[in-house]
A protein has these predicted regions:
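Hydrophobic positions on the alpha1 helix immediately C-terminal to the Walker A/P-loop
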Residues: 20
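Walker A (P-loop) phosphate-binding loop of P-loop NTPases
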Residues: 14
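A glycine- and Lys/Arg-enriched "phosphate-lid" helix/loop adjacent to the NTP-binding pocket
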Residues: 99-166
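Hydrophobic anchor at the beta1->P-loop junction of P-loop NTPases
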Residues: 9
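Extreme N-terminal, non-catalytic leader segments
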Residues: 1-6, 33
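Conserved lysine of the Walker
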Residues: 17
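NTP-dependent small-molecule kinase module
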Residues: 2, 25, 138-193
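ATP-dependent small-molecule kinase phosphotransfer cores
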Residues: 33-122
Length: 193
């Protein structure tokens, strides 16, 4: 593993990913450590255009189109991220595990299709650490209620998010490598040192 790792933050809506990645970014900045922070979907200019299309409240893509849009965003991002790979710490808000959790466990897309395209896009780009944020159903609902703007992914029924969160937890059990489940307290303690 490099001293300039790729660190991914995963989890369902309202689980604290954005808070955690922002805390780590502030910590790295305080320590004068070079880093780049991106989100998926989104990140580079073309990926942000795709993000708007995916998250538009009125968008109603079928599950395969939805998958391909997410992977198109990833492909665009990786063109940019490869310039910094092993040169800067790379922080990513959602990545390949989100694709599997949402598209496969949430929407039922064939896992073989997801893995095939993901592997084709990723090639030699490897994640060093994945931090999985989990949240209870009640806390997720409360957190989504206070959001100022909601996208179409914030408006699914709670049982959808529970399926997705179970998907993340299944991935963590299967992979057993580099996925760490975090609480807000742990990450804030780490970054406040």
């Amino acid at each position: 593993m490099s001293n300039k790792p790729v660190i991914v933050f995963e989890g369902i809506e309202g689980s604290g990913k954005s808070l955690h990645i922002s805390s780590v970014a502030k910590y790295l900045k305080r320590k004068n450590i070079d880093f780049i922070k991106v989100r998926e979907p989104g990140g580079c200019i073309n990926s942000e255009k795709i993000r708007k299309l995916i998250l538009e409240k009125k968008s109603n893509f079928n599950k395969i189109t939805d998958l391909l849009l997410y992977l198109a965003s990833r492909s665009e991002n990786l063109d940019q991220l490869k310039k910094y790979y092993k040169k800067k710490v790379i922080l990513i808000d959602r990545f390949k595990d989100s694709t599997i959790a949402y598209q496969h466990y949430g929407f039922g897309v064939d896992i073989k299709l997801i893995n095939f395209i993901n592997n084709f896009i990723l090639k030699d780009f490897n994640v060093d650490y994945t931090f999985l944020n989990t949240v209870s159903k009640n806390n997720m609902i409360q957190r989504l209620k206070i959001r100022k703007s909601l996208n179409r992914y914030d408006k699914f029924k709670s049982n959808f998010y529970q399926k997705v969160q179970r998907g993340f937890l299944n991935l963590a059990k299967k992979i057993k490598v580099n996925i760490k489940s975090l609480t807000q307290i742990k990450i804030l303690n780490i970054t406040n040192q």
